[in-house]
Design a protein with these regions (language model features):
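Mg2+-dependent prenyl diphosphate-binding active-site environment of isoprenoid biosynthetic enzymes
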Residues: 12, 16-23, 27-121
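Conserved glycine-bearing catalytic or ligand-binding loops at nucleotide- and phosphate-handling centers
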Residues: 3
Length: 121
């Protein structure tokens, strides 16, 4: 298998892990916060942090990937939280992240803050 193919396969797997641990809610307020958090996480990226965590787990003898999956997702959520908060008007006031509107531009500054906080928790 070519390196690019292997990398693409791993990214697909990591993206599925990240989506697996995103919460759901029927509550209207919570749903908007979750939607904003999902918008941020699903913007893409290299996913290098969870990939390194998975490979480190394997190199240390880990066999059951179910054990490391929540930590992989949490690591990416924490990274995304830092980006969401960094983009806020009180910080860098960025309009775009990864080629699309930032979370606070789509959902408002208040939900940008709440989405970032939710990703950290």
């Amino acid at each position: 298998m070519m390196f690019k193919d292997e990398l693409d396969n791993r990214l697909l797997y990591i993206n599925s892990v990240i989506k697996e641990f995103l919460p759901e809610s029927d509550n209207e307020l919570y749903k908007k916060i979750i939607d904003a958090a999902c918008y941020s996480v699903e913007a893409g990226g290299k996913r290098i942090r969870p990939m390194i965590m998975l490979e480190t787990y394997r190199l240390c003898g880990g066999k059951d990937e179910e054990i490391v999956k929540p930590f992989m997702a949490a690591l990416e959520y924490i990274h995304t939280y830092s980006l969401v908060h960094d983009d806020l008007p009180a910080m860098d006031n960025d309009d775009y992240r990864r080629g699309r509107l930032t979370t606070h531009k789509v959902f408002g500054e208040d939900f940008g803050i709440l989405a970032g906080d939710a990703l950290l928790n």
